[in-house]
A protein has these predicted regions:
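Hydrophobic, well-ordered secondary-structure elements that form the walls
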Residues: 57, 79, 94, 124
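Alpha-helix capping/hinge segments and adjacent helical runs
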Residues: 84-96, 125-129
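Alpha-helix-loop-beta-strand connector modules within alpha/beta enzyme cores
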Residues: 77-79, 118-119
Length: 137
């Protein structure tokens, strides 16, 4: 598909996820179902690095809703709740950041997140590096 054509119909939400190769087909099928239920007129484009388990998703909701926060929430839920059922990660290669930090628990256990916080506090005791990008400390 042509990226310019896809991006010409905003809003377009981009996602970067990773999951086991054996789960790819099932995840895409389940995502099509979840996204289709949330946005019957929406369009889903899937690109990626299938050999390493990374997918790039371009979601165009085409929603009649005027509430951009509600549209984004529904799009995020369709991607990440489906991803959780397939034991995927919310970021394949583009990091967590503010957009994904509320979904980090899907990819990492509470123990792993606690360790990440501890490392952050140890390496950045004054919290000046990337404040609030992955989690609040």
């Amino acid at each position: 598909d042509d990226f310019e054509r896809i991006l010409a119909e905003p809003p377009v939400y981009l996602y970067d996820v990773s999951l086991p190769l054996r789960s790819m087909d099932a995840y895409i099928s389940d995502l099509e179902d979840a996204f289709g239920k949330a946005f019957p007129q929406g369009v889903l484009h899937v690109f990626g690095h299938l050999c390493d388990g990374n997918l790039h998703l371009f979601l165009t909701p085409r929603s009649p809703s005027e509430n951009p926060h509600e549209i984004r929430r529904l799009a995020d839920e369709s991607v990440y709740q489906t991803l959780a059922r397939h034991h995927g990660a919310v970021s394949a290669e583009h990091g967590i950041g503010r957009e994904k930090k509320d979904w980090l628990h899907i990819s990492r256990s509470s123990e792993e997140i606690a360790l990440m916080r501890k490392l952050k506090r140890t390496l950045d005791p004054t919290n000046i590096l990337n404040r609030g990008l992955v989690f609040d400390v």
